[in-house]
Structures are given as C-alpha cells and as structure tokens.
Amino acid sequence: MYKRQSEYRVEHEDIAKRTLRNACLRFLAFGETHLADVLVSKQFHEANNMTDALAALSAAVAAQLPCRDALMQEYDDKWHQDGLVMDKWFILQATSPAANVLETVRGLLQHRAFTMSNPNRIRSLIGAFAGSNPAAFHAEDGSGYQFLVEMLTDLNSRNPQVASRLIEPLIRLKRYDAKRQEKMRAALEQLKGLENLSGDLYEKITKALA
C-alpha cells in the first residue's frame, strides 16, 4: 500500500497509484475478514478524495464485510443532500451481491435522497439493479422482472422516455434459458396490456415478443 499524498493531486503518477491501491484493496477485501474489514474501514475514514472513499465502500459492499452497513450509513449521512454523489451510493446498493438486495432496493424507493421525478436517481437505483445486477434481476422466481414491471408501470405515465430506456434488460429475453424467457415474456405481456401504453414502450415490447 502506498502512502497517500497529504494533498489530493490530479497527476498521472498519483492517479496510477490510487488505481493500483484500490485494485489491491478490492482483492484484499475478499481475503481474511478481520484484516479486510480493518483495511477497508481505514481507507474510507482516511480518504481525502472521493475516489478512495468510493473504492473502500465498493470493496465493503462487494465482499459483504462487517463494516459495510456502518460505512454506507456514514456516507449517506454526509452526502444525502448531494444528488450526484448519492447516485454512486444508490448504484452500490442496487448492485450488491446480498441475497436481500431486491428488498433493499424496494426500501430505498422511500429514501430521503431518492425521487421518481429525477431520471438520474431512477437510473442509479432501478436502472442499476435491472441492468447491472444480473444475478438478482434474473432470479429464478421472477421477482426482479416483476419489480421492473411495477416501476415501468409508474414511469409509463410519469416519464415514458426514461421507461423506454429502463426496459432494455427485459426485452433481451432470447438470451436466456427457457424458464426465464417464459417469465420475461409474461412480464412484457403484462406491460403490453397497460392502458395508455407509451408509443416507445409499445414498439419495444411488441418487437421483443415477436
């Protein structure tokens, strides 16, 4: 681990060192739990830049370290009024490998920093879950598909342009096994039956079902 500069600098050498440091930290996070927990917590609390802080937070989430919840709460408490910074936090929450990630995402729909009227928040939470957490989105029970159907139903009237982009993971059904294709097709049929279905959604849904 290199010794950080006392002052954050955007120099090629410093950027390279941060990149290497954070790659090493992520590998270490999957090693001995106590040591990983200490190292990740230390980097998060001593970080003098967002890159290092987010790298520590990401490692804690990916490896499901004991410090994860406390660090996520600290980040939330500090940055909840900064939407763009919180987008990073929502993405980490939505792409977590935790078994209860869908439950977490549903709960975050009520978070103080989240709103269905902001496309960036929608993409960072709902979009990240559907598009960047395949294990959870494609759960065998179809719960991920049903969640997206609920969100798209809301957005169909609220913001059809955003809905049209969010549906992408659901219309790629032909890439998956027969069981998942069946559930994805059922989800698309459910959306197709909506009253006042937007033109953009209708076009994508009918093409996927053809």
Task: Place the predicted regions along the sequence by residue.
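Long, ordered, helix-rich scaffold segments
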Residues: 3-210
